[in-house]
A protein has these predicted regions:
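Short acidic/polar hinge/loop motifs at secondary-structure boundaries
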Residues: 61-62, 165, 183-210, 298, ...
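Membrane-embedded beta-barrel scaffold of Gram-negative outer-membrane proteins
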Residues: 365-377, 481, 489, 522-575, ...
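C-terminal beta-signal and adjacent terminal beta-strands/loops
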Residues: 648-655, 679-761
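Extracytoplasmic beta-strand/coil segments of soluble accessory domains associated
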Residues: 143-184, 204
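Gram-negative outer-membrane beta-barrel transporters
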Residues: 449-452, 547, 551-555, 575-656
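Short, acidic, small-residue-rich periplasmic hinge/interaction motif at the N-terminus
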Residues: 30-34, 39-44, 73-77, 87, ...
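N-terminal periplasmic accessory domains that precede
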Residues: 92-96, 142-145, 164-167, 193-199, ...
Length: 761
């Protein structure tokens, strides 16, 4: 009898799970067009939850029969809530369409602290510019796309090859750290021409931090950083095509496609091609107004779905460009010769980068990248051939403990640079000696929430530079929300930067001037602080206004400034015997009216100077005031949108090359404005067209010439005195030598454009 009772108990025990009837709830989550990943899906009040995968699918397994409330949650979208009753044998399929909160989505940021938060909640002021903003003034690359961002100026550094850098708050390009998906992939050599190789088609959004960011990104982020966030596979269309042509015979084409490999892997591939092969010389100086360019960029991103929605993505980009500028009758056979002047640059670049979340309970993320950049260039008879490889890896631990939100990380970067100049040769013997810099580092950052209105962020980073040894960069940030809901943020930090003249100053390569280095150059050191005030106003009928005001101050020791003025034939480099300062005020106003009219206005006042031997000198090629605007208006009745964009710059001091140089010492007030009309009345299509440089501004106006001695680019006919100074002759009345560095704006006038954009989801 006891055995029978035991048998019955065992049978009932083993059968008990079968007596509880259960089913699965599954479906797909989208925003109406794109799949949404990492959405929290749960049954309210019960321990059943999951996250949507990379293609938006979710599944709640073994849910017992009963009545529940199914809910979803993700930052930037309205919450979904639905009452459901499970009482059948069939699995429940419930697809969810979430409506995005436009303002919140636009303001999700990650660059300030390496954590994704709403922009208003971030202790670090971050500006966000998404792909829709970039499309309001169509361009082929990152360099051109930033023309209408307040406080940022893409600076053209050569009238012939059109190399340039991106300046934040008046500081030259090398003080700006450019990241791709949070990684320092854009190396110093690639800033010379590589910025034109980052196509807008691969950009989901651009995040800009103006001011100190050294504790998590490294000491080189002195002036600020630009973080290019690449497109997500889940939100990209299955196929897209975007192409436009201009009246200058420029043709830019972007094509992308997405496909899946099995159920776990999603692959996004994009190709950009820019073609301009039309030598234009509208100012009749015998030289091309802008350089001719043929480039292709191929981008591919793999997203691998893993258990528990752990992250794993891999991406690669290949970039190849040929560009030349010079005398309009230059051909490849003249490359490097002294009969017809040309600047010819061949660039090849390969990048591989990824992000992997470790399979642990703790939030551990490993990011890694490898890039190689090769440049083969001729500037007249001067040859510059350089190669740079950079390997990078970083492990980050994201941990919350009570009111403390920690970020702890370790990073390692190895940079190898070699060229055919004396910069990478031994002082004695002339043997090749590539520059090798090994840079391991650790950092700790903690965000402490004092109360509901106040937070403080502290951070410190230690790097060991194999050349310059120990580098310590602290960081401090404070945020307070006032009673009127306005926000005040204070950020301070330090910076440290070693200078590579030949990758940072294009004028050192042209051969037009001789480079003189007076001493062993010490690394630059800086202290900077930024005070920010933000206030958002909400009105009836979905109207929004955001006001943003910042004051910034940067103090430099050991500042290295190229001296063009002491001797017109030389570029003299040395650490200044004094200090440098960059300070100013910046204001942004963003209006959003009923989703039909958007207005973004910005203005920046700058005071950038060097004080040496009790003498204060303004930094050349630096404006005291700049403004930018983007105005968009939809005419729904006709399916049209009008975009009006532009910028304005105050006069800046320009580099003359002699006392008799007849060119203006300062630039005029100047502005480049654009207008675009977009028709979106055909499903999945946009047809757009407009005018760039609407009022046909050219830097050569009111100047006798831009390029000095364009008729004698090899200086074959100049005469010099016994001290090597150029003297006046009938052929050279201003005692000048060839010099193309007098440049402050693009030498490209008004042009019309027409394009077609297609997306299939």
């Amino acid at each position: 009898m006891k055995k029978n009772k035991l048998f019955i108990v065992v049978v009932i025990y083993l059968s008990f799970p079968l007596l509880i009837k259960s089913q699965s709830i599954e479906g797909k989550i989208t925003d109406g067009e794109n799949a949404l990943e990492m959405v929290d899906v749960y049954l309210k009040g019960h321990n059943y939850s999951c996250k949507s995968d990379s293609v938006g699918n979710y599944s709640l397994k073994k849910v017992p029969f009963g009545t529940y409330i199914l809910e979803t949650s993700i930052v930037g979208y309205t919450k979904f809530s639905k009452k459901i009753k499970i009482d059948s044998k069939q699995n429940y399929k419930i697809d969810v369409n979430l409506r995005g909160n436009k303002i919140v989505l636009k303001e999700l940021v990650v660059s300030g602290t390496l954590k994704q938060v709403n922009r208003m909640e971030s202790l670090v002021p971050v500006e966000v510019y998404n792909s829709k903003f970039l499309n309001k003034n169509p361009s082929s690359c990152l360099f051109d796309a930033l023309q209408t961002v307040n406080g940022i100026r893409p600076q053209v550094n050569c009238n012939i090859c059109n190399t340039g850098d991106i300046r934040i708050n008046g500081l030259p390009g090398p003080y700006t750290m450019v990241l791709i998906d949070g990684m320092p992939i854009v190396s110093s050599l690639s800033t010379v021409y590589g910025l034109s190789g980052i196509p807008n088609a691969m950009i989901d959004k651009i995040e800009v931090v103006k001011g100190p960011a050294s504790s998590i990104y490294g000491s080189e982020a002195i002036g600020g950083l630009i973080n290019i966030i690449t497109k997500k596979n889940s939100s990209s269309p299955q196929f897209s095509f975007d192409s436009y042509a201009t009246s200058w015979s420029e043709l830019n084409t972007d094509v992308s496609a997405k496909f899946n490999i099995g159920n776990k892997i999603s692959v996004l591939t994009g190709v950009n091609n820019f073609y301009f092969n039309n030598a234009v010389d509208k100012n009749k100086d015998g030289f091309t107004d802008i350089s001719l360019q043929k480039r292709i960029s191929i981008f591919q991103k793999w997203n691998i779905e893993r258990k528990n929605n752990k992250q794993f993505s891999l991406a690669a980009r290949y970039f190849n460009e040929e560009r030349w500028g010079g005398e309009t009758n230059w051909r490849k056979e003249f490359r490097g010769g002294d009969s017809i002047y040309g600047e010819s640059i061949y660039t090849k670049r390969l990048e591989i980068f990824g992000n992997y979340q470790l399979p642990t309970k703790e939030k551990l993320f490993l990011s890694f990248s490898l890039n190689n950049h090769h440049q083969d260039s001729r500037y007249g008879t001067s040859s510059y051939i350089a190669n740079q490889s950079v390997g990078f890896a970083q492990l980050v631990w994201d941990k919350k403990i009570n009111k403390n939100d920690f970020l702890v990380g370790a990073a390692i970067r190895n940079t190898v640079y070699d060229d055919n100049t004396t910069a990478t040769s031994l002082e004695f013997g002339g043997l090749n000696n590539p520059s090798k810099i090994f840079l391991p580092g650790i950092f700790v950052q903690n965000e402490y929430k004092i109360d509901s209105a106040q937070s403080i962020l502290t951070g410190i980073r230690y790097d060991y530079n194999s050349v310059h040894k120990n580098i310590v960069t602290p960081r401090l940030a404070y945020k307070i929300i006032l009673k009127n809901k306005s926000i005040i943020r204070l950020n301070s930090g330090t910076g440290f930067r070693a200078v590579n003249l030949f990758t940072e100053d294009h004028a050192a390569l042209t051969g037009a001037r001789k480079v003189v280095i007076l001493e062993n150059l010490n690394p630059e050191k800086s202290f900077n602080t930024n005070l920010n005030y933000t206030k958002k106003f909400s009105f009836n009928n979905k109207k929004e206004l955001t006001f943003d005001l910042s004051a910034f101050y940067t103090y430099f020791n050991n500042r290295i400034i190229p001296d063009y003025l002491t001797d017109p034939n030389l570029i003299i480099y040395k650490n200044i015997n004094g200090y440098g300062v960059s300070r100013g005020l910046s204001m942004n106003v963003d209006f959003d009216f009923n989703e039909t009219t958007d207005i973004i206005l910005g203005g920046t006042f700058l005071d950038v100077f060097i004080k040496e031997n009790q003498q204060k000198n303004q930094q050349i090629l630096t404006e005291n005031f700049s403004a930018s605007w983007t105005i968009s208006h939809k005419i729904e009745k006709y399916d049209l949108r009008i975009d009006y964009t532009g910028n304005l710059f105050s006069p800046m001091q320009l580099p003359l090359i002699g006392e008799l140089d007849p060119r203006n010492e300062k630039s005029p007030w100047w502005s480049i404005q654009n207008i675009q009309l977009v028709f979106f009345g055909i499903r999945n299509f946009e047809i757009y067209g407009g005018i760039k440089n609407l009022f046909d501004f050219l830097p050569g106006k009111n100047n006798p010439f831009l390029i000095a001695r364009a008729n004698d680019p090899f200086d074959k006919n100049i005469k010099k005195d016994s001290n090597g100074n150029v003297i006046v002759t009938p052929d050279n009345p201003y005692a000048l030598s060839f010099d193309p560095t007098y440049v402050f704006a693009p030498n490209q006038g008004r042009r019309y454009f027409l394009g077609l954009r297609y997306s299939l989801f």
